[in-house]
Amino acid sequence: MVLYTTPFPNSCLSALHCVSWALIFPCYWLVDRLAASFIPTTYEKRQRADDPCCLQLLCTALFTPIYLALLVASLPFAFLGFLFWSPLQSARRPYIYSRLEDKGLAGGAALLSEWKGTGPGKSFCFATANVCLLPDSLARVNNLFNTQARAKEIGQRIRNGAARPQIKIYIDSPTNTSISAASFSSLVSPQGGDGVARAVPGSIKRTASVEYKGDGGRHPGDEAANGPASGDPVDSSSPEDACIVRIGGEEGGRPPEADDPVPGGQARNGAGGGPRGQTPNHNQQDGDSGSLGSPSASRESLVKGRAGPDTSASGEPGANSKLLYKASVVKKAAARRRRHPDEAFDHEVSAFFPANLDFLCLQEVFDKRAATKLKEQLHGYFEYILYDVGVYGCQGCCSFKCLNSGLLFASRYPIMDVAYHCYPNKCNDDALASKGALFLKVQVGSTPQDQRIVGYIACTHLHAPQEDSAIRCGQLDLLQDWLADFRKSTSSSSAANPEELVAFDVVCGDFNFDNCSSDDKLEQQHSLFTHYRDPCRLGPGEEKPWAIGTLLDTNGLYDEDVCTPDNLQKVLESEEGRREYLAFPTSKSSGQKGRKELLKGNGRRIDYMLHAEEGLCPDWKAEVEEFSFITQLSGLTDHLPVAMRLMVSSGEEEA
């Protein structure tokens, strides 16, 4: 399949579209700024309360007449541009495919050679997030502002979290082979000028986010303007890039516990012990992009294995080459111990995105300029990106669309096929956006017999109003039909002579319903959950005890307790914190107007990550290895991102 790299089939239509949008944009921008000036966020309200001279109100009163005059002057040009823009949308393609062409063999092509479908299994990491990159006036309805700056910061945080150096912990003690849950922290020392991660001698040091330079020793802000300096994607999966931490049984005696003093008097939250402010996170320095000093390091980074006694005379862990195994090999070792023995996989609230993130699905990337900024930042890690997904005008749907679908997909692996469908059954405000589903087929490897190993991913955003359960169920029905059609239309295999082997089938996105509200019973019992497994769900209306909500209470986004990834992580690990800062379903029979009656559960989990256990290659199975609720985007969105790591094991792997 030929992927679309431009929104229009020829340069003439593209040029005409640029001219028409240039005529519309001044009016669009003025309307957005004018409306935004009358919708303050809680952060701005606090600033105004501390402003005795009321300078902000004075500026608003001064500039409002100017904006109105400019708006009236721009209306004729906007009308003329609209006359050209609207009919052009019938020729517009449903997405834009972006790939960094100068990758050569350093990017996705090299990843395809890592797994041949034999021997040890292969893990794949998926993440989904609603980032609320709406026009600024609309984002303020959700208590968010400064969409352009947030887009850049979101991209930097995701890139820095996914590109973290891989950390492997080995225990020299023959008796103590476990690490306490409190010691799951970022156990890396600052990298040297050559970008090589240094082993930590003696004691273990927590590293704050400002000390981490994720892109080969460069500061994340150094390439904010023009994207990555070298143009190469970050590859954190090679053993040479691993940061080795050895805990000696003779010297250390035991692993560090949560209450152990930290060298230098550094605060336990990894923030250097400084005072916490209420400044929004997207106004911080580029280096403050998600704490690496969190006690919630991903298990992909913190691989636990037992080291032998044959340490080299130099005492350097890097000298023992036998320790540099691939993560998938070490994680399947019999000596591996889970943090949650009562669960088939690990789960956590993490302060940053998982290391070695392979696939990213985002929702509500509506603003075009914000989408471009976000894409440029994500290209520092992901080689393949689909953005500006959706339709405009009256194309594809019965009602006029002012916004696209808001979906964005990023991948480290090559994309083979793409399909997009717009939901026709929408109403109210959702009818103005072309919300739908994006279906992708990616290649993740090849067998020695030249059979392609592929995976299927679907990203969607369902109808938002909570009372419209019937509309969401209809969209879930369409989603299932489109999933089956996409698998059928893109499959080139036959049962007798398969050309492709399916490794995984994942569905994710913002479903806008939860599994604990009595008002969402219709969606909770949908047949989609019989074909795809939800790792957080026990059954309709019944969540696993560790699952938490992914929708934040927008009134508390800028509170000191949750304004940083570390702080939000600590809050969400306690039941009281979840009750205060997560959104909970409200009962229709609430006795007092405006009062929330908190129901069972740990908040509204409306962001889902599902995977199929059937329809894969025979003798292969995909099992959840870890599941994470991520706080790295605190202050930048009103949703918690979620991530899932799947281990795809072949029949040749030992049980």
Swiss-Prot record:
Intramembrane feature ranges: 11-31, 65-85
Tissue: Predominantly expressed in brain.
Compositionally biased residues, Polar residues: 279-299
Keyword presence, Amino-acid biosynthesis: no
Residue numbers bearing the Phosphoserine modification: S178, S291
Enzyme class: hydrolase
Pathway the protein acts in: Lipid metabolism; sphingolipid metabolism
Membrane topology: Lipid-anchor
Cofactor: Mg(2+)
UniProt cross-references to InterPro entries, sorted A to Z: Endo/exonu/phosph_ase_sf (IPR036691), Endo/exonuclease/phosphatase (IPR005135), Sph/SMPD2-like (IPR038772), Sphingomyelinase/PLipase_C (IPR017766)
Lipidated residue numbers (S-palmitoyl cysteine): C53, C54, C59, C397, C398
Ranges where the record places region Disordered: 210-319
pH effect on activity, per entry: Optimum pH is 7.5.
Subcellular location: Golgi apparatus membrane; Cell membrane
Coiled coil: none
Active-site residue list: H639
CDD domains reported in the protein's UniProt record: nSMase
Primary localisation category: Golgi
Binding residue positions for Mg(2+): E364
Role, per record: Catalyzes the hydrolysis of sphingomyelin to form ceramide and phosphocholine. Ceramide mediates numerous cellular functions, such as apoptosis and growth arrest, and is capable of regulating these 2 cellular events independently. Also hydrolyzes sphingosylphosphocholine. Regulates the cell cycle by acting as a growth suppressor in confluent cells. Probably acts as a regulator of postnatal development and participates in bone and dentin mineralization.
Name by which UniProt lists this protein: Sphingomyelin phosphodiesterase 3
Organism this protein belongs to: Homo sapiens
